[in-house]
Amino acid sequence: MEPVSRAVEETNRRMLRARDAMDRAYAQPLDVPALARIAHVSEAHFTRTFRATFGETPHRYLQRRRVERAMFLLRETDRSVTDICFEVGFGSPGTFSRTFRDIVGRSPRAYRREATTMPVPTCFTMAWLRPNA
């Protein structure tokens, strides 16, 4: 294997390690310094490489991950929007609603109303039923 290929492979492995940590601990406070430590790279290198690897910033990935989980909870539970907001890791209902609307295109409450009449694709449901291990 060429040295360049090994370097790229190692970089990908480090970025996947950080993304996996984000997937497991999405509801916890995560920041770039902590994620860079997980990937064993500098903060600037982490942000640049994560974006190049996954097509979005670490912050945006984490927001999207949290919103995806919130979508599931809004569809499948009757818990309040505020409870869901805090469970998925947002610090305030206002930030949650703005981010949700930005990503989904409607408010959490509107999504819940509409989601009760829409079928859920099996592949999406199965992704949320897998264990967190």
Protein language model annotation of sequence segments:
Residues R60-R64:
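Short, basic-rich loop-to-helix N-cap that marks the start of a DNA-contacting helix
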Residues M1-H45, A52-T53, T57, R69-A133:
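Alpha-helical bundle regulatory/interaction domains
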